Amino acid sequence: MTTTLTRPTDGEGSVQVHQDPGLNIQEETLVIAVYGKGGIGKSTTSSNLSAAFSKLGKRVLQIGCDPKHDSTFTLTHKMVPTVIDILEEVDFHSEELRPEDFVFTGFNGVQCVESGGPPAGTGCGGYVTGQTVKLLKEHHLLEDTDVVIFDVLGDVVCGGFAAPLQHANYCLIVTANDFDSIFAMNRIVQAIQAKAKNYKVRLGGVVANRSADTDQIDKFNERTGLRTMAHFKDVDAIRRSRLKKCTIFEMDDEDEAVQAVRSEYLRLAQNMLDKVEPLEATSLKDREIFDLLGFD
C-alpha cells in the first residue's frame, strides 16, 4: 500500500526545499544567477560581467555550477580544481580546508570557485552547489564580497540546479535570437515564477548574445513582459578571448569591436548595481511560442 504525504510546494508541482537560514548570503550583497540554453555563452557572459564589476571597483565572487568546471578559466587563465574534488581529497572533512584550497584569484582580483559535480549519471549537482555556499560561509568568504555571480549549468531548472535561485536577487537569462534559445528561456521563466513565490529571486532581464539582430527576442519580450538588458553581437574578439583563455578586458585595446563589447558589459554591470526594477514576466505555453516566433 502506498501512502501519499501532503507536502508544501515550492511553486507549482515541486516540493518545498527549506534552506538553512545560516546559508543566506547577506542582504547588502548583489547576487546574480545566470541561466540559458546550453552552449549559449553563459560562462563567457558571467566571466566578462564579473570582470566589469571588478573594473567598477567591486569585490566579486564567481561560482561555476557546472560539472565541466569551465566557468572561470578566462578569469584564472587555467582550469582550477573543483570544490567536490578538494573535498574528496580530505574525505569530506571540510574543517581541514583552507580558503586558498578552493578559492582562486582571477583577473583584477575576481575570486573564482568551481563547485564541480558528481560523476555523470550519479548524485545531484545542485547539492554540490549548496555545499559550496556552505563552505564559503564557514570560511567567512562571503562577508567581504559586493557581488556574487552563479554561472549555472545549461537550461536545467530541476530542484537541484535551481538551488542558486534560492540565493539570488536577480536572474539574468542569456539567449540568442533563435527559436531553441528562446524556447529554453521560456522554461527558465517558468522556474523563476515558481521560485519567486518562496524566495527573493526576481527576473532581471535578458542578455542577447551572439546575435546580429534581436527581432525574435523582442517579440518574446513584448509578449511576456521581459526586457533586454544588454546585446552582444557575434564579435570574433569574444571567440578569440576564449581561445586565449582571457576576458574581453584583456584583449587588444585598439580594436573598436573590443571597446564596444567592454562598454556594453560595463553598462550592464552599472545598471545591475543601480537596482534593476524586477520584472513580473509571464511564461508562454509551448504552442504559443511556436506560433509567436518566426516569419510570416
Swiss-Prot record:
Task: Name the EC number(s).
Answer: 1.3.7.7
Write down the InterPro entries for this protein, in alphabetical order: NifH/chlL_CS, NifH/frxC, P-loop_NTPase, Protochlorophyllide_ATP-bd
| Chain positions recorded as ATP binding sites | G39, I40, G41, K42, S43, T44, K68, N209, R210
Q: How does it assemble?
A: Homodimer. Protochlorophyllide reductase is composed of three subunits; ChlL, ChlN and ChlB.
Q: What does the record give as its pathway? A: Porphyrin-containing compound metabolism; chlorophyll biosynthesis (light-independent)
Task: Please cite one Gene Ontology biological process associated with this protein.
Answer: light-independent chlorophyll biosynthetic process
Name the lineage.
Bacteria, Bacillati, Cyanobacteriota, Cyanophyceae, Synechococcales
Stated name of the protein = Light-independent protochlorophyllide reductase iron-sulfur ATP-binding protein
Molecular function GO labels: 4 iron, 4 sulfur cluster binding; ATP binding; metal ion binding; oxidoreductase activity, acting on iron-sulfur proteins as donors; oxidoreductase activity, acting on the CH-CH group of donors, iron-sulfur protein as acceptor
- Cofactor binding annotation: Binds 1 [4Fe-4S] cluster per dimer.
Q: What class of enzyme is it?
A: oxidoreductase
Q: Which reaction does it catalyse?
A: chlorophyllide a + oxidized 2[4Fe-4S]-[ferredoxin] + 2 ADP + 2 phosphate = protochlorophyllide a + reduced 2[4Fe-4S]-[ferredoxin] + 2 ATP + 2 H2O
Q: Spell out the family assignment given in the record's similarity comment.
A: Belongs to the NifH/BchL/ChlL family.
Q: Which organism is it from?
A: Parasynechococcus marenigrum (strain WH8102)
Q: Which positions does UniProt annotate for [4Fe-4S] cluster binding?
A: C124, C158
> What PROSITE patterns does the database record attribute to this sequence?
NIFH_FRXC_1 (PS00746), NIFH_FRXC_2 (PS00692), NIFH_FRXC_3 (PS51026)
Q: Does the keyword Hydrolase apply?
A: no
What residues bind Mg(2+), as annotated? S43
Q: Which co-factors does it depend on?
A: [4Fe-4S] cluster
PANTHER family, alphabetized: LIGHT-INDEPENDENT PROTOCHLOROPHYLLIDE REDUCTASE IRON-SULFUR ATP-BINDING PROTEIN (PTHR42864:SF2)
Keywords assigned by UniProt, alphabetized: 4Fe-4S, ATP-binding, Chlorophyll biosynthesis, Iron, Iron-sulfur, Magnesium, Metal-binding, Nucleotide-binding, Oxidoreductase, Photosynthesis
Q: Which domain of life is it from?
A: Bacteria
Q: Which HAMAP family match?
A: ChlL_BchL (MF_00355)
Q: What function is annotated for this protein?
A: Component of the dark-operative protochlorophyllide reductase (DPOR) that uses Mg-ATP and reduced ferredoxin to reduce ring D of protochlorophyllide (Pchlide) to form chlorophyllide a (Chlide). This reaction is light-independent. The L component serves as a unique electron donor to the NB-component of the complex, and binds Mg-ATP.
